[in-house]
């Protein structure tokens, strides 16, 4: 590793000092903990999800899953070079979309269910219209969004005409899909962006990064509004709380955490019963009372968010869980894994 010159070291020290000051200011305003305030609340039942369906069709690691707004259909992306749209009620495939690049890392369904987007190591985001077929009978590609200098790690639709992406070049991009142009393009973090979650009202979003921080953004502006610290390793995934007043995050540092936007800091921390797994993806129930995280050991863990009590483990996958997604009505959880399976938990 090259030696850091004194001037650069001075800047590092100054930045670290500022960060520590932010942390100290936040800590000074923490007059109580969530556990203290919720100690007299009743316990929630142990999580009752069980693996009801296994969606088989991929022949390589499945890296991502996302539900459509109808809570019935979901899309998965795999290193076999295919997107598959599933009917989760019947476990049937609705469409199979072959990709030009097999290295897909993220997928997204538009809330309307009209479009899906994907991207990965091809350094671009590709959008398909699921209601229109090309000459070969597969969903028609309508946009190829290029200009990235790193892999695409996350993408989410605001609506059928607008998309937000995060990528390995540390950038956040906003796209007008009708025109096929970027409306915003800016550096979001000091490291690869790993996850992105939209607020319930679609006016703000949270990003997580390998720089160990999460940030709050307004969809209308470039600069972040708030920055959150706490994790000791990469922030793998973030998920907005259904109230819109907070969010959860998880990391391979073997913790998940809850942050309150109004308190401007972490309010809870969740750990597995045995500290033997890091986490790759997180989701909150529609009530916000349950937090679920997919683990690198192949299980989905659940906690009572208020009392910070572990409420169960969903077992079935045989390898690392890569992504989990809860359908909008909260009745089904989908998980993907390196074991090539997509599991539905009901």
UniProtKB/Swiss-Prot annotation:
Keywords: Cell projection, Cytoplasm, Repeat, Sensory transduction, Transducer, Vision, WD repeat. GO terms for cellular component: axon; cytoplasm; heterotrimeric G-protein complex; rhabdomere. WD repeats lie at residues 57-96, 99-138, 147-185, 188-227, 230-269, 274-313, 316-346. This is Guanine nucleotide-binding protein subunit beta-2. G proteins are composed of 3 units, alpha, beta and gamma. Interacts with Ggamma30A/Guanine nucleotide-binding protein subunit gamma-e. Belongs to the WD repeat G protein beta family. Guanine nucleotide-binding proteins (G proteins) are involved as a modulator or transducer in various transmembrane signaling systems. The beta and gamma chains are required for the GTPase activity, for replacement of GDP by GTP, and for G protein-effector interaction. It is found in: Cytoplasm; Cell projection, Axon; Cell projection, Rhabdomere. Expressed exclusively in photoreceptor cells in the compound eye (at protein level). GO terms for biological process: G protein-coupled receptor signaling pathway; negative regulation of opsin-mediated signaling pathway; negative regulation of smoothened signaling pathway; phospholipase C-activating opsin-mediated signaling pathway; phototransduction; visual perception. The keyword Transmembrane helix does not apply. Transmembrane segments: none annotated.
